[in-house]
Every structure is written in structure tokens, then in C-alpha cells.
């Protein structure tokens, strides 16, 4: 695995849907074979994965929203790396 480049644009893979699930009280990724429960951090990142923003814009938006979180850049990049490896997202 390798960290995504800052100019790549993440997009949810076909067949995946991101939404808040009241019964689970969290954001989830739904796909034909099941569901992935996401923690709060993953939910905040995936809210910004819209197929238009590049990784740099996502990092900048979250850094601005959560300035008190140390190492947020690396956390975001690592999550996107894992999401890509799990085939939840594609990087364009």
C-alpha cells in the first residue's frame, strides 16, 4: 500500500453508498454484500469524498475544521490508503 497523492481525486466505488444510519448511530458504507460501520473520523473524511475534491482539498478542509488535532494530515492520508486497499474508494 502507498499513501494517495495530494492531487488524486477519491471517489466511492460503484455499488457503495455512504450515509448516516440512525439505527447504528453512525455513518456507514453500504454495498451489495453488506455494510461497514465507520468511526467519526472516517465519516468526516468520507463526507468530503465527492469525486470533485482532490486529496489536498480534503486535507485542507479538515485541517481548518479540526485545527486542534495533531497529525491530522497523516491520519487522513492513512485512512484514504486503507479505504483504497479495501476497495471502498477509487483514486482518479
From Swiss-Prot:
Cited Pfam families: PqqD
Pathway(s) annotated for this protein in UniProt: Cofactor biosynthesis; pyrroloquinoline quinone biosynthesis
Keyword Glycoprotein: no
InterPro entries, alphabetized: PQQD, PqqD_bac, PqqD_sf
Keywords for this protein: PQQ biosynthesis
GO MF, one example: quinone binding
Transmembrane segments: none
GO BP, sorted A to Z: pyrroloquinoline quinone biosynthetic process
Keyword field contains Disulfide bond: no
Role description: Functions as a PqqA binding protein and presents PqqA to PqqE, in the pyrroloquinoline quinone (PQQ) biosynthetic pathway.
Family designation: Belongs to the PqqD family.
NCBIfam families: PQQ_PqqD, PRK02079.1
Quaternary state and interactors: Monomer. Interacts with PqqE.
HAMAP family (UniProt xref): PQQ_syn_PqqD (MF_00655)
Name of the protein this chain belongs to: PqqA binding protein
Lineage, broadest ranks: Bacteria, Pseudomonadati, Pseudomonadota, Gammaproteobacteria, Pseudomonadales
